[in-house]
């Protein structure tokens, strides 16, 4: 038929498509027609072949085939045991054919590989070409469920064959229809590599290895007439860092003596020992399995008693050349007492330079301050040079430089409970009575160079007075603390009260001031610097309240910022620094650089002139609180 392929024996059906069965002849049995009309669908919707459904029908059973299972299966699960053709002895299905064109298998595609022919001459023998693959064991296999897919054949790579021998059987010249005779080759070892070196998809397998027998070497007999030189054992090797120090009360092994060849004894035989040489120490057994290492660091065992006296825990100490038992100590930098040993590392001065073998009981107890105390008493700080002094307002003290003890004061001076020193002046050093003129301020020029107080007599404005003042019994007058001017918390308010007080006299004769300053005792140290700046006008004679005279001489203002940068000890009240000297001027209050002042008050023994007993001729210390 042109459009169909009659189903017969030996013709495989390789394509499944929708098919329908028809009975063109009336010779088909009517019972089979009833089966086809009622139970067998002619066109399957899922594309299942009709013969497959016919074979799986439970009511149709062919003689040689087993009955199919009754469970339903899809088109991809049919068993390969059922062929796609009907048996030939059933004549009723002989003329059943397909109505659609079926894709046939090309007979030229399945071409069997022919017999491999060898070259005619043995001189042209070579290895197998790479395009010839090893034939599979079953070349005609089809896939069980997909017949158009061939099974995968593992590729083992090229076969490396050795050179074939010259004695080979030739094939006949003409090809015959019979089976081809392969050449008979001698058995040779062919190394076949199952897995290629660059394949990552192949399972790894052990490569074939050839086992080579070990070469037996003859045993050499030891020479009886020559003793071999044995190398020194490793235990005697000091190593890079030298021999390890020994524990106390231990002795070092004697050094190995060089082997000296003795008299040749041809008859005596030296036995060869398999075990290593025994250790000279007691209580240590050699281990033949362990590699021989240095044993110099191993202390002696507990079985060996030390020769020295029994001691407690062995602690390392320093090594000294003068020590009589130098080999019994281990060189180390750790002292016997670990707590006292931390002193030099922390910078304690008392722990430096002491021997290491000093016992704890012999060591002096450490002080609290960890600083050495000198036997000399504390000295006053030396005055710094003038170039190093700078105006600093950080440390100001109102405590005076009082002599210690206070009994060292001169007879004309006395101290009060508030820290003031009062000096009694002679009777002639009193100012004249007069009314204070109104204040008059003038622009102050640049100050003169500062000079210390000890050079007071050398200044141009002050001639050098005699150093031995006259003292009268009447000048030695003591006053109670109640006569002292009260202290005010506000220095400005205190100055204002001093200005408006009518009983305070601020006029002073320069000659009387010079004599008063000359009668004062010299201070214990340089305490001041003199500023001679004409800020106000001081008349020569006390004028009337309505007259104004030109200035004749400037007032003497003593300002001495001494000891500003000196170190002040807070524990000693007798050592302090005061800032300046100040004298009241007739022009009113002068604002100084620091509220800490001491003033000069004059006291006259007679009060008949109507002047207040206290005049500005006494030192006033501590008139302001601390500014620290």
Swiss-Prot record:
Record keywords, A-Z: Host-virus interaction, Inhibition of host innate immune response by virus, Suppressor of RNA silencing, Viral immunoevasion
Pfam families (UniProt xref): Tymo_45kd_70kd
GO terms under biological process: symbiont-mediated suppression of host innate immune response
Chain spans, region Disordered: 1-25, 141-332, 347-398, 418-507, 535-628
Feature: compositional bias, Pro residues: 434-450
InterPro entries: 45/70kDa_tymovirus
Compositional bias segments (type: Polar residues): 320-331
Bias type Low complexity, positions: 299-312
Superkingdom to which the source organism belongs: Viruses
Comp. bias (Basic and acidic residues): 497-507
Keyword Secreted (UniProt): no
Transmembrane stretches, start-end: none
Function as written in the Swiss-Prot or TrEMBL entry: Acts as a suppressor of RNA-mediated gene silencing, also known as post-transcriptional gene silencing (PTGS), a mechanism of plant viral defense that limits the accumulation of viral RNAs.
Family membership: Belongs to the tymoviridae protein p69 family.
Protein name (record): 69 kDa protein
Organism: Turnip yellow mosaic virus (isolate TYMC)
């Amino acid at each position: 038929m042109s459009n169909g392929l009659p189903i017969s024996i030996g013709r495989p059906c390789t394509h499944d498509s929708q098919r329908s069965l028809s009975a063109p002849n009336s010779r088909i049995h009517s019972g089979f027609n009833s089966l086809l009309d009622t139970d067998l669908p002619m066109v399957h919707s899922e594309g299942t072949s009709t013969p497959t459904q016919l074979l799986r029908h439970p009511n149709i059973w062919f003689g040689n085939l087993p009955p199919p299972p009754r469970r339903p299966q899809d088109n991809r699960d049919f068993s390969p045991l059922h062929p796609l053709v009907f048996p030939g002895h059933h004549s009723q299905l002989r003329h059943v054919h397909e109505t659609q064109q079926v894709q046939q298998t090309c007979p030229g595609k399945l071409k069997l590989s022919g017999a491999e022919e060898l070259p005619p001459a043995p001189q042209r023998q070579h290895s197998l070409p790479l395009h010839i693959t090893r034939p599979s064991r079953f070349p005609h296999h089809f896939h069980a469920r997909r017949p158009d897919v061939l099974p995968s054949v593992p590729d083992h790579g090229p076969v490396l064959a050795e050179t074939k021998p010259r004695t080979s059987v030739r094939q006949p010249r003409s090809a015959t229809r019979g089976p081809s005779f392969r050449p008979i080759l001698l058995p040779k070892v062919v190394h076949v590599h199952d897995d290629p070196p660059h394949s990552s998809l192949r399972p790894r397998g052990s490569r074939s290895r050839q086992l080579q027998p070990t070469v037996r070497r003859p045993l050499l007999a030891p020479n009886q007439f020559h003793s071999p030189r044995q190398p020194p054992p490793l235990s005697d090797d000091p190593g890079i860092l030298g021999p390890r120090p020994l524990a106390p009360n231990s002795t070092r092994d004697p050094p190995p003596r060089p082997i000296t060849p003795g008299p040749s004894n041809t008859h005596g035989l030296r036995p060869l020992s398999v075990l290593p040489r025994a250790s000279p120490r007691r209580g240590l057994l050699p281990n033949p399995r362990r590699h021989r290492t240095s044993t110099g660091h191993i202390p002696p065992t507990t079985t060996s008693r030390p020769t020295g006296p029994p001691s407690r825990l062995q602690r390392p100490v320093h090594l000294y050349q003068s020590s009589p038992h130098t080999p019994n100590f281990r060189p180390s930098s750790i002292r016997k007492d670990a707590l006292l040993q931390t002193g030099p590392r922390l910078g304690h001065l008392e722990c430096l330079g002491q021997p290491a073998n000093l016992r704890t009981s012999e060591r002096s107890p450490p002080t609290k301050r960890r600083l050495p105390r000198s036997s000399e008493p504390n000295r006053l700080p030396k005055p710094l040079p003038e170039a190093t002094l700078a105006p600093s307002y950080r440390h100001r003290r109102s405590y005076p430089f009082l002599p210690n003890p206070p009994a060292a004061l001169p007879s004309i001076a006395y101290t009060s409970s508030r820290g003031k020193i009062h000096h009694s002046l002679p009777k002639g050093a009193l100012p004249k009575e007069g009314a204070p003129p109104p204040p008059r301020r003038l622009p102050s020029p640049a100050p003169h160079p500062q000079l210390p107080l000890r050079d007071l007599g050398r200044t141009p404005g002050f001639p050098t007075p005699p150093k031995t003042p006259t003292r009268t019994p009447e000048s030695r007058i003591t006053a109670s603390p109640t006569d002292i001017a009260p202290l005010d918390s506000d220095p400005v308010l205190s100055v204002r009260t001093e200005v408006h007080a009518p009983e305070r006299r601020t006029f002073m004769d320069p000659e009387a001031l010079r004599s008063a300053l000359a009668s004062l005792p010299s201070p214990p140290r340089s305490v001041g610097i003199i500023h001679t700046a004409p800020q106000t006008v001081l008349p020569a004679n006390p004028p009337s309240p309505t007259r104004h005279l030109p200035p004749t001489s400037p007032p003497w203002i003593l300002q001495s910022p001494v000891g500003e940068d000196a170190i002040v000890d807070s524990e000693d009240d007798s050592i302090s620094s005061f800032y300046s000297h100040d004298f009241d001027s007739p022009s009113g209050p002068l604002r100084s650089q620091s509220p800490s002042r001491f003033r000069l008050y004059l006291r006259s023994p007679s009060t008949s002139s109507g002047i207040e007993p206290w005049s500005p001729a006494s030192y006033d210390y501590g008139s302001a609180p601390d500014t620290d």
